Amino acid sequence: MEEAERFPRLVSLACHDLRTPLATIYGFARTLTRSGDYDERTMRFLGMIEAAAEQMTEQLDDLGVAARIKGGRFDPLIREADTLDLARSEDARVETVGSGERVETDAEAVQGALSALAIAAIRHGPVERVTWTVDGRSLTLAPVTDAAAPVVLGEQIRDLGAVVARLVVEALDGSVALDGGSLRVVL
């Protein structure tokens, strides 16, 4: 195995091996929470453990995707999706407007990438809300402050989701670029 392949394989292996103990932590916290036999404080702590385990699972997923892309083993699941739907987020701080276009892409990976870019813009802005403006294959995220721009672009390695988001978009032949106070993604 060449050196360039070794590190991405190591990261993939670590992600895989960490899932079992993490699933155990999540499973026990969830089981205890469902029993409801605890005081309010303990239930709150169990909920925090559950939420942290879910977040860590998402981060392991991101690391696995990055390792597959960097290792040349990314195998996207291509299907037709509307760009407006891809930009929609469950997070109330992210608004989506405009008109989409049907594209062939890895919808789940792209939707996760767009969500991660929006959350990074909010977190590192810091700003209260952001908006995706969709115009066909072109999606514009605003505002992206000067403080958030290098993080959202993945140039400053301070947000795993943003770094992986850019890798995903570019692996699917898209682009991510700063355009004044906004981020432009072309799918």
Protein language model features and the residues they cover:
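Short alpha-helical segment of the dimerization/phosphotransfer core of two-component systems
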Residues: 51-56
